[in-house]
A protein has these predicted regions:
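Short, surface-exposed ligand-recognition loops at beta-strand->loop->(often short) alpha-helix junctions
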Residues: 9-20
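An amphipathic, aromatic/His-enriched active-site/gating alpha helix that lines ligand/cofactor pockets
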Residues: 24, 28-38, 54-89
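Non-catalytic surface loops within mature trypsin-like serine protease
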Residues: 10-12, 55-57, 94
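Polar/charged side chains located within well-ordered beta-strands of beta-rich proteins
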Residues: 18, 39, 51-53
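Catalytic "initiation/cleavage/transfer" segments centered on a nucleophilic residue
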Residues: 80-105
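Active-site-flanking beta-strand signature of metal-NTP-handling nucleotidyl enzymes
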Residues: 2-9, 50
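A short beta-turn/loop motif at secondary-structure boundaries
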Residues: 41-46
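Flexible, glycine-rich phosphate/dinucleotide-binding loops
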Residues: 48, 58, 96
């Protein structure tokens, strides 16, 4: 499947709710460990969220994560108008330990 970057900006009053949903995805990924996926989410100072997913497996293992389904429900309504999820295929040009496993994660 490759690398995908998704960018969106929730409404200010829904950003913490969105973060809670994202954290639940990571908690379930940690307990299920579906393999074939590397995934990171960043929250920028302006409230924008950026998700970076490197999916090796086909089909996408995130489709089997219940918390991911809950996160996706209502995502457009949580976002500012015109700031909904914008997924784009991406190519990693360079990385210094970013996609490597870390004992501090």
């Amino acid at each position: 499947m490759g690398t995908v970057v998704v960018r969106y900006r929730p409404k200010a009053n829904r950003a913490d709710e969105n973060q809670d949903l994202v954290e639940a995805v990571f908690a379930e990924l940690g307990s299920v460990d579906p393999g074939g996926v590397r995934y990171a989410t960043l929250r920028l100072a302006d409230g924008t969220f950026i998700h970076i997913a490197d999916i090796e497996a086909d089909p996408n293992p995130l489709g089997n994560i219940a918390a991911f389904a809950r996160f996706q429900e209502g995502i457009v309504e949580r976002c500012e108008p015109g700031e909904g999820p914008n997924p784009q295929a991406a190519t990693v040009v360079g990385s210094y330990r970013f996609f490597a496993e870390s004992s501090s994660s």
